Curated annotation (Swiss-Prot):
Entry protein name: 3-isopropylmalate dehydratase large subunit
Gene: leuC
Function in brief: Catalyzes the isomerization between 2-isopropylmalate and 3-isopropylmalate, via the formation of 2-isopropylmaleate.
NCBIfam families assigned to the protein according to its UniProt record, in alphabetical order: leuC (TIGR00170), PRK05478.1 (NF004016), PRK12466.1 (NF009116)
Family: Belongs to the aconitase/IPM isomerase family. LeuC type 1 subfamily.
Source organism of this protein record: Natronomonas pharaonis (strain ATCC 35678 / DSM 2160 / CIP 103997 / JCM 8858 / NBRC 14720 / NCIMB 2260 / Gabara) (Halobacterium pharaonis)
Reactions that this protein is recorded to catalyse: (2R,3S)-3-isopropylmalate = (2S)-2-isopropylmalate
Record flagged with keyword Metal-binding: yes
Source taxon at top rank: Archaea
UniProt-recorded Gene Ontology molecular function terms: 3-isopropylmalate dehydratase activity; 4 iron, 4 sulfur cluster binding; metal ion binding
Assembly mode: Heterodimer of LeuC and LeuD.
Cofactor: [4Fe-4S] cluster
């Protein structure tokens, strides 16, 4: 076993060879695919008469274009139906498992992998989706890849990559009331910048990270890419192992779990591992964070004032002016009181069961504001079923939320769930780019699920700490 960081160890464990161009060829332990980025890759294989090398290490789902209101086939959207049908044909020919809506296992690719135990410490994981870094929460090296790389992995079960530096981000202390993993990652991106992670992989550590459950760790690793990093990870620990023990992969095979656990423990970063950079953030100073602009790095604490562009670094000033104009905000204001038209609770960042529970604690006993249309889109069919078993669906529906089927939904404008005109959306998703939620004039405010819930019932961005929580049964 090599020494150093988890990144060093897992990289070396999976390195096949070093290529003439200096890149390393890595074996891929898990390849996740979906309906949007895989069709061209399969087409390129057919042109060359190449078969999928390891269908047993490839797993498919549908999430990006699948509707969340009515998933009956054929889909009303012809383009979406064509993508679904093409994926079905591709996986059938290759012998790849597909979690479609008929299976009870369908959902966002970065939700179903962990919940089924496909995601494990010490694995290399790739997917044609930028938020593949989510799986790093388990101590995996997980990378988003492009179509040509999807082709290469399908054909060879390997990928050529350049090794990056490692930045350790220590979040110390205890989080305050109403502060979540989403607030941690928005704070990190705000401080280091959306390009601050370029050339790096992030290792998240410190008391505040260690105290998070797996869902919180996934939220943080999920948005590593928004901070410019190639990937992000958390070292596996007992929290990780307890999660895995209950998944499909190990619930009925405890012996296999015990066989793999020593390897998982061995890939943890060594206490004396050397890092290329170390950043420390005091978690006790973080408050609920919301974005005021059109990048995830344009965020502030809920009590802070929107910055004046001239007070920002020179290369950020023009972007800030355009963002403030688009969002209709002014320097010196806070985001508290910003009117909201739509509340979206979902996405691969925040659509897991604890996310829904925490939002339901705010929603219970209250009603969605008259000016707001609100929806909850569970991250997977399993999350949806578990939430319904706990009665969370009733909490949301009684308050006036739409309770939807699983999918990516309003995180991106590739399906029926989109903003209209200049609607402002309180969103638990990961990106607030202009046009991201379907309308070029739409305005997205990123925040935690609890903050989305608070905005839904007040009709404006609201400090969730001002709203007493109700009890919901877990």
């Amino acid at each position: 076993m090599s020494e150093g960081t988890l990144y060093d160890k897992v990289w070396e464990n999976h390195k096949v060879t070093t290529l003439p161009n200096g890149q390393d060829q890595l074996f891929v332990g898990l390849h996740l695919i979906h309906e949007v980025t895989s069709p061209q890759a399969f087409g390129m294989l057919r042109e060359r008469d190449i078969e999928v090398a390891r269908p047993d290490l490839t797993h498919a789902t549908v999430d990006h274009i699948v509707p969340t209101a009515d998933q009956s086939r054929p889909l009303d959207n012809e383009a979406a139906e064509e993508m679904m049908a093409e994926l079905e044909e591709n996986v059938r020919e290759a012998g790849i498992t597909l979690d479609d809506p008929t299976t009870g296992n369908q959902g966002i690719v970065h939700v179903i992998g962990p919940e089924q135990g496909l995601t494990q410490p010490g694995k290399t994981i790739v997917c044609g989706d930028s938020h593949t870094s989510t799986h790093g929460a388990f101590g995996a090296l997980a990378f988003g890849i492009g179509t040509s790389q999807i082709r290469d992995v399908l054909a060879t079960q390997t990928i050529a990559m350049e090794k990056k530096d490692v930045r350790k981000i220590e979040v110390t202390g205890e989080l305050g009331e109403g502060v979540t993993a989403k607030d941690i990652i928005l704070t990190i991106i705000r401080r280091l910048g959306t390009d601050g992670g370029v050339g790096y992989v992030y290792e998240y550590a410190g008391e505040a990270i260690e105290n998070l459950g797996m869902e919180g760790r996934m939220s943080i690793c999920n948005m590593s890419i928004e901070g410019g990093a190639r990937a992000g990870y958390v070292n596996p620990d007992e929290t990780t192992y307890e999660w895995l023990r209950e998944t499909d992969a190990f619930a009925d095979d405890p012996e296999r779990f015990e066989e793999l656990k020593p390897y998982w423990e061995s890939v943890r970063s060594d206490p004396d591992a050397e890092y290329d950079d170390v950043v420390t953030i005091d978690g006790s100073e973080i408050e609920p964070v919301v974005t005021w602009g059109t990048t995830p790095g344009q965020g502030i604490g809920i009590t802070e004032e929107i910055p004046a562009p001239e007070d920002l670094p020179a290369d950020k000033q023009d972007t800030a002016r355009r963002a403030q104009d688009h969002m209709g905000v002014e320097p010196g204001e806070t985001m508290a009181g910003y009117n909201i038209d739509v509340a979206f609770l979902g996405s691969c960042t925040n659509a897991r069961l604890p996310d829904l529970r925490s939002a339901a604690e705010i929603i219970k006993g209250r009603e969605v504001h008259d000016s707001v249309r609100a929806m909850v889109v569970p991250g997977s069919q399993r999350v949806k079923a578990a939430a319904e078993d706990e009665g969370l669906d009733s909490v949301f529906k009684e308050a006036g939320f739409d309770w939807r089927e699983a999918g990516c939904s309003m995180c991106l404008g590739m399906n029926d769930d989109q903003l209209v005109g200049d609607e402002a959306c309180a969103s638990s998703s990961n990106r607030n780019f202009v046009g991201r939620q379907g309308s070029k004039d739409g305005r997205t405010v990123l925040m935690s699920p609890e903050m989305v819930a608070a905005a839904a019932v007040t009709g404006e961005v609201t400090d969730v700490r001002e709203l007493p929580k109700a009890e919901v049964e877990a």
